[in-house]
């Protein structure tokens, strides 16, 4: 029996169990994927408790993607941005499949030479920024707290052209960016139903990508559509990062279509 799970706080919004359980069933693997709400002061207990119980792997979501790095060895992109969203509990290795998820979600868009604004400098923000740098974009990271934003940029600038911009002055970038990415929880079910930038900033922007997937139609996505921007839904990043995590745990490339359909079904309820 294969035991997998996701830890976060809050976690009720997660559709990862529906998505991964559908993949397990489709591949004929006897296993189960469960969601666990973990209080911030119990992270270590949760990780090592899952290992002790024989879990093969965990996904890690808000607010643990950065704090969990102290418990695992870092591999690939996780080592570059000190952010983990997938753990192999047998080897105690942390991976970042969010970077892969962002690249797959944005694969239909030519991003070389574009200027992208990433709002948020946490785990999702650093993953989105690294993906965009790898795809040839210049990246501006805007964050509410300057120290955290500058720390992220210091980490990212060795992989491409990346600068910090205070979120309080983000309106000054109007007309200067081609892509806007929300990598904050704003708009997520259970968080404030707001958008991370002034609506007028979206005028003339080519592409808007919201990493939030629940609800699918976030306030930012709705505003971007109204203003004629191409939009990419967070569900695409979710599905592709999940597929890569599944492959790490099982050695099998799952059917992305099966995972997407299961995630969409779960979002409707």
From Swiss-Prot:
Task: Cite a single GO MF annotation.
Answer: NADP binding
Pfam families xref list: SDH_C, Shikimate_DH, Shikimate_dh_N
Q: Where does NADP(+) bind?
A: 120-124, 143-148, 211, 234
CDD domains attached here? NAD_bind_Shikimate_DH (cd01065)
Assembly mode: Homodimer.
- Residues recorded as binding shikimate, renumbered to this chain, are 14-16, 61, 85, 98, 213
Which example biological process does GO assign this protein?
amino acid biosynthetic process
- EC no. given is 1.1.1.25
InterPro entries attached to this UniProt entry: Aminoacid_DH-like_N_sf (IPR046346), NAD(P)-bd_dom_sf (IPR036291), SDH_C (IPR041121), Shikimate_DH (IPR011342), Shikimate_DH-bd_N (IPR013708), Shikimate_DH_fam (IPR022893), Shikm_DH/Glu-tRNA_Rdtase (IPR006151)
Q: Which residues form the active site?
A: 65
Q: What is this protein called?
A: Shikimate dehydrogenase (NADP(+))
Q: Write the record's keywords in alphabetical order, separated by commas.
A: Amino-acid biosynthesis, Aromatic amino acid biosynthesis, NADP, Oxidoreductase
- On whether NADP is a keyword of this UniProt record, the answer is yes
Reactions accelerated catalytically? shikimate + NADP(+) = 3-dehydroshikimate + NADPH + H(+)
UniProt enzyme class: oxidoreductase
Q: What is the lineage of its organism?
A: Archaea, Methanobacteriati, Methanobacteriota, Archaeoglobi, Archaeoglobales
Please explain the role this protein plays, according to its UniProt record: Involved in the biosynthesis of the chorismate, which leads to the biosynthesis of aromatic amino acids. Catalyzes the reversible NADPH linked reduction of 3-dehydroshikimate (DHSA) to yield shikimate (SA).
| Pathway info | Metabolic intermediate biosynthesis; chorismate biosynthesis; chorismate from D-erythrose 4-phosphate and phosphoenolpyruvate: step 4/7
The entry sums up its family as follows: Belongs to the shikimate dehydrogenase family.
């Amino acid at each position: 029996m294969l035991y997998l799970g996701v830890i976060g706080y809050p976690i009720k919004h997660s559709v990862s169990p529906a998505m991964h359980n559908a993949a397990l069933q489709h591949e004929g693997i006897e296993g189960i994927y469960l969601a666990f709400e973990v209080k911030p002061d119990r992270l270590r207990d949760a990780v090592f408790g899952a290992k002790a119980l024989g879990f093969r792997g965990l996904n890690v979501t808000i607010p643990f993607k950065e704090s969990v790095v102290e418990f695992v060895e870092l591999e690939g992109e996780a080592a570059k941005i000190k952010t983990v969203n997938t753990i192999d509990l047998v080897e105690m290795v942390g991976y970042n499949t969010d970077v892969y998820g962002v690249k797959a979600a944005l694969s239909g868009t030519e991003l070389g030479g574009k200027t992208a604004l990433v709002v948020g400098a946490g785990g999702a923000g650093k993953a989105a920024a690294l993906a965009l740098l790898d795809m040839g974009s210049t990246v501006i990271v805007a964050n509410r707290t300057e120290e955290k934003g500058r720390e992220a940029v210091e980490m990212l600038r060795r992989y491409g052209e990346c600068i910090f911009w205070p979120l309080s002055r983000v309106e000054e970038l109007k007309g200067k960016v081609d892509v806007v990415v929300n990598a904050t929880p704003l708009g997520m079910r259970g968080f404030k139903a707001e958008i991370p930038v002034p609506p007028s900033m979206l005028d003339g922007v080519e592409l808007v990508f919201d990493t939030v997937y629940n609800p699918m139609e976030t306030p930012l996505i709705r505003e971007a559509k109204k203003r004629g921007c191409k939009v990419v839904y967070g569900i695409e990043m979710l599905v592709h990062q999940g597929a890569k995590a599944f492959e790490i745990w099982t050695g099998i490339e799952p059917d992305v279509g099966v995972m997407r359909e299961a995630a969409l079904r779960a979002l409707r309820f």
